[in-house]
């Protein structure tokens, strides 16, 4: 009996999370931010690291925990998330100073990226998503998404950049030469 109750509780927990993320994204962001502040100590440092007169960029924004954390401290936040479903959650973010873009290119002239999201038991495993370089495996869903370099992303000075893109950080930095030399963000 206990095993059945535990399984049911686990399933309801997953559904509850899904429903909250789908229909109440701002509640999900607040909950994630509260949890992340306990787990990720660097979030507590943001008030001292983020310049309130400059732009902050969250590359690999996922559902927006860092976006929400950056929002009170930056003049404007640009959240970049290539996964269309997660970008949709970010677009529902209830703040006027947040802009959502879908993907970051490694070089000028690249206007589209292909995202490969692995399927596990027929469901997308968001944590396993990565840029497809034409060598994707069978159990993936492909998305073509608009891309922009970090240099083209912001037209005002950028003071802070967070990059979490599952091993493609150097690709992101390749498209940020001007931003890094002129703006010198943290």
Task: Report each predicted region and the residues it spans.
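Phosphate/nucleotide-binding beta-alpha loop and adjacent structural elements of enzyme active sites
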Residues: 1-186
């Amino acid at each position: 009996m206990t095993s059945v109750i535990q399984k049911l509780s686990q399933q309801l927990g997953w559904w509850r999370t899904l429903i909250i993320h789908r229909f109440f994204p701002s509640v999900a962001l607040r909950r994630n931010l509260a949890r992340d502040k306990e787990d990720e100590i660097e979030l507590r440092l943001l008030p001292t690291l983020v310049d309130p007169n400059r732009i902050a960029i969250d590359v690999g924004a996922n559902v927006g925990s860092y976006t929400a954390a950056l929002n009170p401290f930056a003049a404007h936040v640009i959240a970049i998330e290539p996964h269309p479903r997660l970008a949709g959650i970010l677009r529902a973010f209830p703040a006027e100073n947040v802009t959502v873009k879908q993907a970051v290119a490694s070089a000028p002239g690249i206007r589209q990226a292909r995202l490969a999201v692995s399927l596990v038991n027929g469901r997308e495993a968001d944590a396993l998503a990565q840029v497809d370089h034409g060598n994707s495996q069978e159990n993936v869903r492909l998305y073509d998404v608009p891309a922009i370099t970090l240099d083209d992303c912001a037209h005002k000075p950028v003071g802070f950049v967070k990059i979490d893109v599952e091993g493609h950080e150097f690709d992101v930095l390749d498209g940020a030469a001007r931003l890094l030399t002129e703006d010198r963000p943290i």
